[in-house]
Amino acid sequence: MYRHGISSQRSWPLWTTIFIFLGVAAILGVTIGLLVHFLAVEKTYYYQGDFHISGVTYNDNCENAASQASTNLSKDIETKMLNAFQNSSIYKEYVKSEVIKLLPNANGSNVQLQLKFKFPPAEGVSMRTKIKAKLHQMLKNNMASWNAVPASIKLMEISKAASEMLTNNCCGRQVANSIITGNKIVNGKSSLEGAWPWQASMQWKGRHYCGASLISSRWLLSAAHCFAKKNNSKDWTVNFGIVVNKPYMTRKVQNIIFHENYSSPGLHDDIALVQLAEEVSFTEYIRKICLPEAKMKLSENDNVVVTGWGTLYMNGSFPVILQEDFLKIIDNKICNASYAYSGFVTDTMLCAGFMSGEADACQNDSGGPLAYPDSRNIWHLVGIVSWGDGCGKKNKPGVYTRVTSYRNWITSKTGL
């Protein structure tokens, strides 16, 4: 005979029930807290925009120096975008906007934009609508003279990495702006990461010897006198990054090309090209500087910047971090005065600094860049650190190789 079992029901102890309740409540609390945090805390968002300009063809792919007409258009668009967003209901969320490229097409030109905003994720959909509407309004009300087509505006969200890729191949673009004001490389201040991403350290047998400027993924521009007695390319490497001996990237040198008329005594035609054995990969901290057009003219008192890892004073110590300073262009007539350089500065050279001796490059800054910003704050290589009498002396400013005088020579050797 089979006997049916008798099941008995047992209740949970009170403390177990309380423990389970508190555990579930804690999980719900954390979940709700994370959700609120995710929806409320601001994040940075990146957008790529495009619109059409009819009837006029522009060609600025951002990889080379732009024409004056393209620069004027890009500057006007950027100014109008800045004004439009700063005077809108989303001015608090607005961070930055810029023109990336102007590309020709069959009926005119396409303008490529990059925009940056910061807002809570919950506002993503509505924010994109507001941004696009503001761009449409800007084109309709303020861009008629440029033949902009408001209906052509497109806007899409992109990742931070995609945003960086838009500008990494562009020349002369900084990631970070400089923060110094009126200090000098001699006893100067350190630069920020990404402020001068084209600056390179020419290392001879593993030690910093000269500076150079990255002008393409394979070529650098430097001073011929750096290599006059050290011309074996196998002895040279190139470091990129603001810390001279802890580089982001290092490359071997394949070839060094001197100017054919380089003269050591007077440092005439003090310019050299350095060809890398392997291309560099552009990043936000390693970028090329724009080469100027041969017809670019600088005026007295124009602002320029010199950078380098040279000594902090004559026969002094070397910095670890890249140094920077703002200088002024000095007219060659002043530089050639009897109390200055007495006619030794030729038309293929330029002077920069202060006659009072406030700022200067110094030893082992040779070959480094003298950079000039255009109206859009895009930087052009206008000079190469060449020579001077001491460092920061009164009436003895730095003398630089004038890059515009050698544009045809650079093109003949590199195709740039």
From Swiss-Prot:
Q: Where is the Peptidase S1 domain?
A: 185-415
Membrane topology is: Single-pass type II membrane protein
Give the top-level enzyme category.
hydrolase
Q: Which residues cross the membrane?
A: 18-38
Paired cysteines (S-S): C210-C226, C335-C351, C362-C391
What EC number(s) does this enzyme carry?
A: 3.4.21.-
How does its activity get regulated? Inhibited by aprotinin, leupeptin, benzamidine, SERPINA1, SPINT1 and SPINT2.
Q: In the UniProt entry, which residues are flagged as the active site?
A: H225, D270, S366
Pfam families per record = SEA, Trypsin
Q: Which CDD domains match?
A: Tryp_SPc
What GO terms are given for molecular function? serine-type endopeptidase activity; serine-type peptidase activity
Residues in SEA domain copies: 43-160
Q: Where does the record place it?
A: Cell membrane
Q: Which residues lie on this side of the membrane: Cytoplasmic?
A: 1-17
Carbohydrate-modified residues: N72, N107, N315
Could you provide one GO biological process annotation from this protein's UniProt record?
Answer: proteolysis
Q: Which UniProt keywords apply?
A: Cell membrane, Disulfide bond, Glycoprotein, Hydrolase, Membrane, Protease, Serine protease, Signal-anchor, Transmembrane, Transmembrane helix
Q: Which family does it belong to?
A: Belongs to the peptidase S1 family.
Sum up the protein's function in the record's words.
Serine protease.
Indicate what this protein is called per its UniProt record: Transmembrane protease serine 11B
Organism encoding this protein = Homo sapiens (Human)
